[in-house]
């Protein structure tokens, strides 16, 4: 048995192997400057991937350090010499093993075949070379060997024969294959003898070259198109750059479309605004012409109100088109219309203004229906001020409204106070019931009737209110016959408050109409 190599020989051997470009990166992850090796596959690994290989077991991968371990055998060195990252990559890809998971990859059929092949080639190299290392006398051969090795290996197994070279070249390269194998084994200075792996697959796959070339031409170009052994990264970067370029072009087109759509929308908006402005100018000129044609008082009123100068739309109302002077007429049937509405005012219909003391209908009588038909309980309504009609000339600016409202209230309160003085001029003392028209006798009469009927088993409304003839005669219905006095009082009070609120709301509507149409 030959002596084992010393530390110097081991360092020289691995220095030559690691100088090859394909061995400068980890076989599994591609990390730079790997310092560990898998003797089973003849590949170089980084420290992380070496730990993964250790976890697989020595029956699948035997790991050693190229820098720390000094007990290498000649068989192990020959396995590293005939192997290499490039040969392992080509073999795994050729047999369709592209998995990244270590368990899947090194338990596959391709890994088993490659382990057996490395063992056979290492044994043959050890038998031929023994303990000889590379010498400087044959250092000129490796310069030609890598080019021939890479070009022959990749082109022969990944592309059809018609693409690689003429038929004469293939026949020429096929014949010296055994001599290349023998020469590679005889001279270990040639580096990791790639021809040993390159020739045997060629001989076995030569009859099926065209079939393999037709099935996997594109995949072989993408995966092994580079000459440095890391073709996958190069091809993926090209594909990513192409996708990025297409994405940039699509983004530019989308931005251009958005800009064009926005520009068209702005142009259409500007055109519509110009058209509307032209229409407004035409309407303004028409209104100015109408204003110039007016005479005297009509023109002064139009200028004072500022109406008719500008028309908002084609259907807007203009005062200048049909301006007429409205003369206020004195209403003749004020009393009759008031008497017709007494019934509705009494039950809570909406009054024309806020509630006043003279509108309080809480005076009690024998029958509310009979009292509503008389004028004695509503004597104060005769002196009520006639409400003026609302016209365009009677509308005043906003600044004068508070003063006008106060004037109306002071005027009504003055009328009430003067009427009360005339009514109670000779009285020494008056009460609130007398002032507001409440009669105490009626209340006393109602209480006396209740006392009389306290012992009876059943009473009717006619017995309670003393309206026997009315119950059986005319058949008229009044609130006094339906609801008690207290409920009627509460009901009327609520209706009066609602009527007051509605009057205020109506006044606000008129003021808003004045504000809106008074600015034109």
UniProtKB/Swiss-Prot annotation:
The keyword Acetylation belongs to this UniProt entry's keyword annotation: yes
Protein's membrane topology: Peripheral membrane protein
Low complexity bias (residue ranges): 220-232
Residue ranges, annotated region (Disordered): 159-240
Cell compartment(s), UniProt: Cytoplasm; Golgi apparatus membrane
Coiled coil (residue ranges): 242-307
Modified residues (Phosphoserine): 145, 200, 236, 239, 311, 333, 339, 363, 367, 431-432, 512
Disulfide bond sites: none
Region described as Required for interaction with coatomer: spans on this chain: 97-520
GO biological process: COPI coating of Golgi vesicle; protein transport
Family matches, as InterPro entries: ARFGAP/RecO, ArfGAP_dom, ArfGAP_dom_sf
Zn finger (C4-type) start-end: 26-49
Record's compositionally biased regions (Polar residues): 170-185
UniProt domain Arf-GAP: residue ranges: 11-127
UniProt KW keywords: Acetylation, Coiled coil, Cytoplasm, ER-Golgi transport, Golgi apparatus, GTPase activation, Membrane, Metal-binding, Phosphoprotein, Protein transport, Transport, Zinc, Zinc-finger
GO CC annotations on file: Golgi membrane
SMART domains: ArfGap
Superkingdom per UniProt: Eukaryota
Post-translational modification N-acetylalanine, affected residues: 2
Molecular function via GO: GTPase activator activity; zinc ion binding
PANTHER family linked: ADP-RIBOSYLATION FACTOR GTPASE ACTIVATING PROTEIN 3, ISOFORM H-RELATED, ADP-RIBOSYLATION FACTOR GTPASE-ACTIVATING PROTEIN 2
Oligomeric and partner information: Interacts with the coatomer complex. Interacts with C-terminal appendage domain of COPG1.
Function, in words: GTPase-activating protein (GAP) for ADP ribosylation factor 1 (ARF1). Implicated in coatomer-mediated protein transport between the Golgi complex and the endoplasmic reticulum. Hydrolysis of ARF1-bound GTP may lead to dissociation of coatomer from Golgi-derived membranes to allow fusion with target membranes.
Name of the protein in its database record: ADP-ribosylation factor GTPase-activating protein 2
Record organism: Bos taurus (Bovine)
